Every structure is written in C-alpha cells, then in structure tokens.
UniProtKB/Swiss-Prot annotation:
Pfam families: Fer4_12, Radical_SAM. Monomer. This is 4-hydroxyphenylacetate decarboxylase activating enzyme. The lineage of its organism: Bacteria, Bacillati, Bacillota, Clostridia, Eubacteriales. Coiled coil: none annotated. Keywords: 4Fe-4S, Iron, Iron-sulfur, Metal-binding, Oxidoreductase, Repeat, S-adenosyl-L-methionine.
Length: 312
C-alpha cells in the first residue's frame, strides 16, 4: 500500500474522544475554516511550520533558522519579530530550519505515515485501551484522507480495534458513506442550522453536512452517532437554533448531542501561524446558558451532554 496519511499529532490515553481510553490520530487538512478553531495548523494539507516566539532566542543573536532556510522564507521584522513568508515556506520539503533550531522554537506541523507505520502505533497502544477503548480519527478532518483512512480502518477491523471518528461531515456523499461503514462510533459537528450563519463562521454552507447525516441514517449503518456543537455566544447559542436542530434530529431519529463550551485554547496556535484570532476577546458561554440549552434538548427526549460530562 503506497498511500500515505498526513498526520499532525497522535495522542495516547485520550479519554474524551469516544468510549473508554483511546488513541487519537489527528489528520491534517480540513474543508472548513472555523473562526474559533482550536487546531488552525490542521487547515491545509501542505506541510508547514509553527513558530513559538516566546522561546525564540533571536534577541541573543541566534540566526540558526535564517541561515538554514534555503527558500529565504524567514526574516526578522523591524519590530524584532520572526516573520515567515508562508507562500515559499509551504514549498519546503526538508524543514532544515526546524532541525537546526537549538531552542525548539520551530515545529513541523505534519508527518507522513504509511498504513503499516500507523498500525504499529495502534497495536502498541492496544493493551492500554481496556475493553471499551480504541482509536479515534480526528483532525482537521480525516475524510480528507479517505483512501488512506479506509485502508487503516480495514486493518483495524481485522485486528478487532474499535473505531471512532470526529468529522465535519463535509465530503462527497459516496466518500462519507464509504468511510462511515467501517466506523463504530461517530461525532459529527453541526455548527449552525442557519446556512448563511454556518458559512459565515466556517467558510462553507451546511447543506452537504445535513444531507450526509440524513443519508447515513437511511443507510444500514449500525454504529452510534452523536452530534456535536461548539457553542458560541452570539453565533449558535439561540433557542431558535436549538429548536431547528431538535427538529432535524427528531426527523432523522437522532437522540444524542454533545454541546462543547467555547474556549480559546487554540489562540496561541493562531499566533504561531501568523494568523489573527478574532475570537480573542469574544464573550464566554455561561454555565447557566449551557444548562438552559441542555434542558431544551432534554425536554424533547434528546440526550444532551455538556463538555466532558458524557456517558462515553
């Protein structure tokens, strides 16, 4: 199998990404560009770097990265900050700057794995999972590597490994259904039921996502599906949005949703990528508001979990 997957992180002992203790595999590349994203390094499928300016030693005269870069992509601006020319940086294949940095201020965001290399890691972690754990494929969005992912899923099936996925659901329907037929447990995000607001916050309309969920429910798939919503004040926290989602869930016999309280844990990553994070001063969701939304779902016979307080 020559297909390779582009992965930016693998985390063992994950306990909030599906049933039991799991290994989470983070694929690079996402068809959405959510303005609040906690993993903005996952957006592009191109290899790239991140810069931790707080540990960079340029003030002490270090120029290791500049001297190592063969694309002339790294410079210091007049205000003394490290500046990356991303257009030329993303063409790099060697990442000499990362290897030469003595302070680990530069990080390569992606690594290539073959199917066998990834399976070696999963089999290594197998005994850590217990009877109800397994692997969760997340990202980014793993559907962007569907050919590689299907090969991994087949080998997981042969090895009796429980398989979960976290996905936006934004993919061609044949790709979506082909991958999901191998999945035991799925989280699918529904950011907003209003298609214009969905595009405003994520860069894409929600039509394809909703139609894929409907198609999955009409198929003979027998896995467990939990919808997820990152809940953001002023964007998707209205009763109107909740009732529209409740209507959609009841129509499609969906009975579980996980509301995730908005956080800013990804802000540092935005800075390290040279991107502006417009949600840095955005209002927090109160516990009272989260509980109010939860009650709306409960009143309509839908199990609603807040954050990590889940039965899985």
């Amino acid at each position: 199998m020559k297909e390779k997957g582009l992965i930016f992180d693998i985390q063992s002992f994950s306990v909030h990404d599906g049933p039991g203790c799991r290994t989470s595999v983070f694929f690079i590349g996402c068809p959405l560009q959510c303005k609040w994203c906690a993993n903005p390094e996952s957006w592009t499928k191109k290899k790239h770097i991140m810069v931790a300016e707080n540990v960079c030693k340029w003030k002490n005269g270090c120029r290791s990265c500049i001297n190592a870069c063969s694309h002339d992509s790294i410079k210091f601006s007049e205000d003394g900050k490290l500046k990356i020319s991303w257009d030329t940086c993303e063409k790099c294949e060697t990442f000499d700057c990362v290897n030469m940095c003595p302070n680990n201020a530069l990080k390569q965001c992606v690594k290539e794995y073959t199917v066998d290399e990834l399976m070696t890691i999963l089999k290594r972690d197998f005994n850590n999972w217990g009877s109800d754990g397994g692997v969760t494929f997340t990202g980014g969005d793993p559907l962007m590597h569907h050919e590689f992912l299907v090969e991994v899923l087949k080998k997981c099936y042969d090895s009796q490994i429980h398989k979960a996925i976290e996905t936006s659901g934004y993919a061609k329907q044949e790709v979506f259904l082909e991958v999901l037929k191998y999945i035991d447990f799925a989280f699918i995000d529904v950011k907003n039921m209003d298609r214009e607001k969905h595009k405003q916050g994520t860069g894409v309309y929600n039509d394809l996502i909703l139609s894929n969920i409907e198609a999955l429910k009409k198929s003979n798939w027998n896995g467990r599906l939990v919808l997820r919503q990152p809940t953001i004040a002023g964007y998707n926290d209205s009763d109107e949005n909740a009732y529209k989602l409740i209507e959609f869930m009841n129509k499609n016999s969906l009975y579980e949703i996980n509301l995730l309280k908005f956080h800013r844990l990804g802000e540092t990553k935005w800075n390290q990528l040279g991107k502006e994070y417009e949600y840095s001063k955005y209002g927090d969701m109160t516990n009272e508001k989260m509980e109010h939304l939860q009650q709306l779902y409960l009143d309509n016979n839908i199990a609603c979990y807040i954050g990590d307080n889940t039965p899985f």
